[in-house]
Amino acid sequence: MLPFVHEQIGTIIVNFFILTVVCAITLVVCLAILTAIRLCVQCASGVNTLLFVPAFYIYNTGRNAYFKFQENRPPFPPEDWV
């Protein structure tokens, strides 16, 4: 075999190896970014579940109780009681 054929085969093998390594590194970086985004979404969901949902429930319950008891107010005491 001619010597330049060995050089071309070696160059093809090295280029294929470099391309494979670059693709693997790109894949790992993309997976890391997607994992970080997923973690942020899970944290936001946890904050919503643990903080905002109970706050809305307490606010709505108190508001409904306030309006309910506004309609059923007891009468004022007579003036001679004061």
Curated annotation (Swiss-Prot):
It is found in: Host Golgi apparatus membrane. Residues 1-16 are virion surface. Pfam families: CoV_E. CDD domains: MERS-CoV-like_E. Gene3D superfamilies: 6.10.250.1810. InterPro entries: E_MERS-CoV-like, E_protein_bCoV, E_protein_CoV. Residues 38-78 are intravirion. GO terms for biological process: disruption of cellular anatomical structure in another organism; viral budding from Golgi membrane. Its main location: host cell. The keyword Transmembrane applies. The chain crosses the membrane at residues 17-37. Plays a central role in virus morphogenesis and assembly. Acts as a viroporin and self-assembles in host membranes forming pentameric protein-lipid pores that allow ion transport. Also plays a role in the induction of apoptosis. Belongs to the betacoronaviruses E protein family. HAMAP family: BETA_CORONA_E. This is Envelope small membrane protein. The lineage of its organism: Viruses, Riboviria, Orthornavirae, Pisuviricota, Pisoniviricetes.
